[in-house]
Amino acid sequence: MKAFDKEELTIIRKFEHIEHCLKRNVQAHVSNGFEDVHFVHMSLPEIDKDEIDLSVEFLGRKFDYPIMIAGMTGGTKGSQLAGKINKTLAKAAQELNIPMGVGSQRAMIRKPETWESYYVRDVAPDVFLVGNLGAPQFAETMPDRYGIEEALKAVETIQADALAIHMNPLQESVQPEGDTQYRGVLKALAELKAEFPYPIIAKETGAGVSMEVAIRLESIGIDAIDVGGLGGTSWSGVEYYRAKDELGRNLALKFWDWGIKTAISVAEVRYATELPIIATGGMRDGIAMAKALAMGATFAGVALPLLRPAVKGDVEGVIKVLERYIEEIRNTMFLVGARNVEELRKVPLVITGFTREWLEQRIDLPVYLRDRRI
């Protein structure tokens, strides 16, 4: 049997991740918390639905809709599948003028021949594109740790506009071949940010960002946070199906629903920082997306619902899903009397249940609802 090197194993793992997301139920067993967030219906909205403006500004660019296609893949075995997915998503993003990310580029850094699986400029010359590297690769205890050279390579090889640094300690801790080196990551990111000429987005992958972490990230100049909250795809769940033995399966199962729910994470980050927020994590309809926007997010990020049509190369299928979300956001805004996203952040919200209980212990909830969502 052939012995694979670490980079080849990374490429194989990316393929397995796509396969499990498509073929198995890898959703969290708990919600993302937005069922506890309620709009107050306005019987007299005092606006026309067709005057609603869904555009938003982010990192110096204006976008037509407050939705982002979250990074999913790249560098898979053979690379053709990842390339097909990314190009399909990019065509949809280009058509709708919304941003998109690519999956982790670790495979590309070590195996440059996989670069084409991330490259979409030939089909989406204008799309705001976000590259993607993992936080552990910048840790002081990581052999061959990354620095500005690798960060520049990730962005410039694919002509991206920004770089996401994904923080995924949960997934790494339950992954058979996971990288659990995180010592010195914040310092390394501060050093990178000081000389890196592109915006940096700190991104979680399903366990959420707390206000403590958000404050640290803001203090070193990070440009935006993708909260990547609990309630959508569970990467511990994905690793459960990849586990090689009973010990690994048990660990992944126990931590399947670990993390901070997306709604809670949005509230904490908005309360504690001034950073732009991308709300990903179980965003499966436009009403929940509108709630995230009302809570202070700039974008709602979506991944898994777009994967199935993207695997087929079905650009229209991807656009159809996104247009459904867009219409649901627009209709929600009409029913609360919000002409634009800025006004949506000022409409009354009622927070109940577990989400309220959590937030009352963590932040000044009345102050957040009254003053901190803008």
Curated annotation (Swiss-Prot):
Q: Which UniProt keywords apply?
A: Cytoplasm, Flavoprotein, FMN, Isomerase, Isoprene biosynthesis, Magnesium, Metal-binding, NADP
EC class of the enzyme, as a word? isomerase
Tell me the NCBIfam families matching this sequence: IPP_isom_2
Q: Which family does it belong to?
A: Belongs to the IPP isomerase type 2 family.
**EC numbers, comma separated:** 5.3.3.2
Q: How does it assemble?
A: Homooctamer. Dimer of tetramers.
Q: Which residues bind substrate?
A: R13, K14, S104, Q105, R106, Q171
Q: Which SUPFAM superfamilies does the UniProt record give?
A: FMN-linked oxidoreductases
- What GO cellular-component annotations does this UniProt entry give? cytoplasm
Which residue positions does the secretion signal occupy? Answer: none
Q: Which residues bind FMN?
A: G71, M72, T73, S104, N132, K203, T233, G282, M283, R284, A303, L304
Localized where? Answer: Cytoplasm
Q: What is its main location?
A: cytoplasm
Name its co-factor(s).
Answer: FMN; NADPH; Mg(2+)
- Please name the PANTHER family in this protein's record: ISOPENTENYL-DIPHOSPHATE DELTA-ISOMERASE
Example GO biological process: isoprenoid biosynthetic process
Q: Which reaction(s) are listed as its catalytic activity?
A: isopentenyl diphosphate = dimethylallyl diphosphate
Q: Which InterPro entries match?
A: Aldolase_TIM (IPR013785), FMN-dep_DH (IPR000262), IPdP_isomerase (IPR011179)
Pfam families for the chain: FMN_dh
Biological role: Involved in the biosynthesis of isoprenoids. Catalyzes the 1,3-allylic rearrangement of the homoallylic substrate isopentenyl (IPP) to its allylic isomer, dimethylallyl diphosphate (DMAPP).
Q: Which domain of life is it from?
A: Archaea
Tell me the protein's name.
Isopentenyl-diphosphate delta-isomerase
